[in-house]
Amino acid sequence: MSEGSAAIGRTVRAGLAGWAPGMRTCGAALAAGAVLSLLPRALPPEVAFLGLVVELAAATLAYGALYRAAFDGPRGWNGLRWGREEWRLLAVQLLITVVMTVVMAVLFVVIGGVALGVARSTSPGFDATSAEAWRAALSGPGAILAGLVPLASLALLAWVGLRLALAPAATVDHGRIQVLSAFALTRGATLTLFVAGLVLIAPAIILAVGLGYARVLIGLSRTAHLAQLVSVGLLFFYLIPVWTAALVDVYRHQVQPVATPGTAKP
């Protein structure tokens, strides 16, 4: 087995193994986060802009409890606590959101520029204000290039997100906010995180799709609230615990590599 495959397998096993301890020690925090995450759906339109903050706070409650447990921090009541770690994690999530928004804005400009360049090169006299002109310009060979750029942009966006994935673990471990300074921690581990994430999320996707078909078969296809409850339940009671455990495992191996037999630890 190659080193990369071994790292992926180790990360997946660590994530799955961390589910039961996470539920046992942080169940109250996970439940509180799940309930809080449902509130934005009940907000009136005038204050709908607060939905993102509420969602981040809900995730912070859950992640904070799991990271505190992983790094032997204050436990609270079954993980339920809002302290310095949570404030730092909330700041980290907000900063990561800002970074990702800036990256998306830049990529949006790049995608638009490439699409405009392709359209003008394939259609002399191209009118950028006409939907028909856009459709005609991007229906030929130029459509391949115009379609590859958004795909490459999505890949780049995912890569940036994965490179910042260990920022919360570093923040709790060091006791200070780590965002861009944690970028180097994922050097050489990006593929591991990507593949392990796909493997860990697969059961949730399969279950969600299965429940969706079941709802249609028994005539509950219009019960949107049930679908929301299922998605929130999968997120807070499966994905967040296993993903956090996987990230902690990768973080520990990246910060302090395991020594091979016959060698001294650094």
Model features per residue range: what roles?
Residues G33-A58, M104-L157, I205-F237:
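Membrane-helix interface segments in multi-pass membrane proteins
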Residues F71-D72, I96, M100, G112:
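Alpha-helix capping at helix-to-loop junctions
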Residues S2-V35, L80-M104, G140-A146, W159-A208, ...:
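Interfacial aromatic "cap" segments that immediately flank transmembrane helices
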Residues S5-L61, Y67-R68, P74, Q228, ...:
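Transmembrane alpha-helical insertion/packing segments
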